[in-house]
Structure formats: structure tokens, C-alpha cells
UniProtKB/Swiss-Prot annotation:
Keywords: Iron, Metal-binding. It comes from Azotobacter chroococcum mcd 1. PANTHER family: HYDROGENASE MATURATION FACTOR HYPD, HYDROGENASE PROTEIN ASSEMBLY PROTEIN HYPD. This is Hydrogenase expression/formation protein HupD. One of its GO terms (biological process) is protein maturation.
Length: 379
């Protein structure tokens, strides 16, 4: 199958891994962070860490949109869903994320809240048309990839004159969060050292490669945009190793079959028409990050659920035993959490990192435990 099988070829993967092992200096460390939930999943699924030399270490960043949602915003969504006049709809993974007191949208639905799962924002628009006596609120989440579809339905709602449709906007921005990662307390203290970034795939198809230029310029941190297949990731890792060996810090694009420098101009223009950048936004694990999220422009304010329902900011209560915030910062791994595997599992998630398949904990639970057990048996 074109563009799938050829990027999963085992012989080529072994050749790339051998090249990385040959070129990686065993006397130094290569600490590389992926910033995409799809990459996290692929890294575990295809056993990429098992192919790398000990000097190349992969660190998982805040690339899972479900995982980075702060509990306070989820509390606000649950408050909305419990209003008798509201139907709240969102993507499936968000239904299971624990909020304050381990309440989730799924539990709120079991207690009679009108919560619907959808696959596309267009379904929310149709729901509003079919239920004129209800207030339909789309709980919008995600990075730049999922933002244009939300912008499109807001424009469509305005053209249709829909009075019972609004959006609770929680779209976040990748480059701002990457800046924040390099400014975390662990990074400043030197306990979290990052030598390079694996740039996100889907996000980069929208924003292009140009927005990553500040990372080599300001921080001396190289970045290579990679696709999702195992050969994509291995080639990107080899490119990062070569940059670091040569003392270079550049933005390189391994995923040339889908990513350009300028990105998707139409998608970016659509987003720009409907949204503007917030002054600040709270991220799980990172705290308040300046200019890291979007809000609905004044021209579309009638579709802003925060304004329509006069929602007040909430401070959520984190599970103190859950290490998800530190895992999202790259400061800890899933194995460092005492809840991991028991009692926290995909069937009983105590933190957001265990909910989505793109979360580091869920990916490690699905694929990493078996490899760890095999390593321990081999010892």
C-alpha cells in the first residue's frame, strides 16, 4: 500500500537503527522530546526505543490535547452540561477524563446531564438545528489541527442565523507550549535537559515549518518534523543526531510528503478570521502559558459559550498522587507514577494521560509494559 507499507519495512528500519547506533556518540547524551500524541503512540507501538542506543533517550512532551486540558476547564464543561437547557457535545476521549473529585463528563451523563459524543463539529451544528429548544454547546479541544473545523462551523452557524449554538473554545497552540517546556522549573534547574525536538506531524501540515524557527535561534535547540510511521521517526532521529554531532541547530523537515514551510494557507486564514490569541491559558502540567490558546473573535461573540453562559474561571483539584502534570512536562515517565497500572488503567483512568491512546501512560500501558517485562526477564 503506497505511503504505508514502505514506511514500515523492517529491513530498512534495522538499517536506520544501525546508522543511528553508529553515529551516536556513546560519550554524550541525546535527549529528544516528541511533541505529538500520535508520535508517542507510534514510538511505543513500533518499539522504537528498543532500536536505539543507550545514549539516545526519548522524552514524552505535552502533545496529547486531551491530556493538557486543565481540570478547571473540564469542571466548567461539566457545569455547563448539568444545566437543564444545555446539550454538551465533544470528542469521545474527553468524556472519560477525570475532573475535580474524579467526576467526568461520562459520570455527569449517568447522572442525567445531556452529554453527546461526536466525531466532527459538523455533528454539533446538525444537533442544534434538530433541537431548536435546546442550547447546544460544542466543547472544542485540540491543537492547530482541529481548529479549522471548529472555525468553519462557527462561520456556518452565523450564516444560518443559529441562535442555540455556541462553542466552549479550548484550542491551544503548539509553539507557545514548546517555549514553555524550555522554561519549566525543571529546565531552568537543569534537571530536564532537552537536546532536540521531534516536531509534530499533523500540526505542521497546518502551520508549516516556519513557526519553529525561534527554537534553533533562541535556544540552540534543533527540531526535525517527522511523520507517524516507524521509518519517519527513525529518519528524524538520525537527522537530529547528525545535527547535534555537527553542532548545528536548524529546523529540518523529514515529513516533506505532507508538510511545507507555509503550511495550509486556507486553513490558517479560516482560523484567523474566527479566532484570536488569548493573553494567557492554563495548561495541565505547564500552568499559565502566555499567548498559548485561542478565543473567539468579537465578530462571532454570539457563539462564545463562555460569554453566553457567563462562565467563571475555575481552579480544579488535581489528584495529588497522579504524576500526569510532571509527565506532560517531560520531568517524569509513566513508570514513576505509583498509581500506574494499579489502580490507574485505561478502564479506570485516574489521570488524563491514561485516557487517550495518545497519552504517554496509555501508550506505555498498551505497549511498554511487555517490553519492560521482557528486559527484566532477560536480565
Amino acid at each position: 500500500m503506497k505511503y504505508v507499507d514502505e514506511f514500515r519495512d523492517g529491513a530498512t528500519a534495522r538499517q536506520l537503527a544501525a546508522r543511528i547506533a553508529a553515529e551516536a556518540d556513546p560519550a554524550r547524551q541525546y535527549r529528544l522530546m516528541e511533541f505529538c500524541g500520535g508520535h508517542t503512540h507510534a514510538i511505543f507501538r513500533y518499539g522504537i526505543p528498543d532500536l536505539l542506543p543507550a545514549s539516545v533517550r526519548l522524552i514524552h512532551g505535552p502533545g496529547c490535547p486531551v491530556c493538557v486540558m486543565p481540570i478547571g476547564r473540564l469542571d466548567m464543561a461539566i457545569e455547563l452540561a448539568r444545566r437543564p437547557e444545555v446539550i454538551l457535545c465533544t470528542y469521545g476521549d474527553m468524556l472519560r477524563v477525570p475532573a475535580s473529585g474524579r467526576v467526568s463528563l461520562l459520570k455527569a451523563r449517568a447522572e442525567s446531564a445531556a452529554v453527546r459524543m461526536l466525531y466532527s463539529p459538523a455533528e454539533a451544528l446538525k444537533l442544534a438545528q434538530d433541537n431548536p429548544s435546546k442550547e447546544v454547546v460544542f466543547f472544542a479541544i485540540g491543537f492547530e489541527t482541529t481548529t479549522p473545523p471548529t472555525a468553519l462551523v462557527i462561520e456556518q452557524a452565523q450564516r444560518l442565523g443559529l441562535k442555540n449554538f455556541s462553542v466552549f473554545c479550548n484550542h491551544v497552540l503548539t509553539p507557545a507550549a514548546m517555549h514553555a517546556i524550555l522554561a519549566t522549573p525543571e529546565a531552568r534547574a537543569g534537571t530536564l535537559q532537552l537536546d532536540g525536538f521531534i516536531g509534530p506531524a499533523h500540526v505542521s501540515t497546518v502551520i508549516g515549518s516556519a513557526p519553529y524557527a525561534p527554537f534553533p535561534q533562541q535556544y540552540g535547540t534543533p527540531l526535525v518534523i517527522a511523520g507517524f510511521e516507524p521509518l519517519d521517526l527513525l529518519q528524524a532521529l538520525l537527522m537530529l543526531v547528525r545535527q547535534l554531532n555537527e553542532g548545528r541547530a536548524e529546523v529540518e523537515n523529514q515529513f516533506t510528503r505532507a508538510v511545507t514551510a507555509e503550511g495550509n494557507r486556507k486553513a490558517k486564514a479560516l482560523t484567523e478570521r474566527v479566532f484570536e490569541v488569548r493573553e494567557s491559558f492554563e495548561w495541565r502540567g505547564l500552568g499559565a502559558v502566555p499567548h498559548s490558546a485561542l478565543q473567539i473573535r468579537e465578530a462571532f461573540a454570539e457563539f462564545n459559550a463562555e460569554r453566553r453562559f457567563a462562565l467563571e474561571p475555575r481552579t480544579g483539584l488535581e489528584n495529588k498522587a497522579c504524576e500526569c502534570p510532571a509527565i506532560l512536562r517531560g520531568a517524569k515517565s509513566p513508570r514513576d507514577c505509583k498509581l500506574f497500572g494499579n489502580p490507574c488503567t485505561p478502564d479506570n483512568p485516574l489521570g488524563s494521560c491514561m485516557v487517550s491512546s495518545e497519552g504517554a501512560c496509555a501508550a506505555w500501558y498498551a505497549y511498554g509494559r511487555q517490553r519492560q517485562a521482557a528486559v527484566e526477564v532477560a536480565r
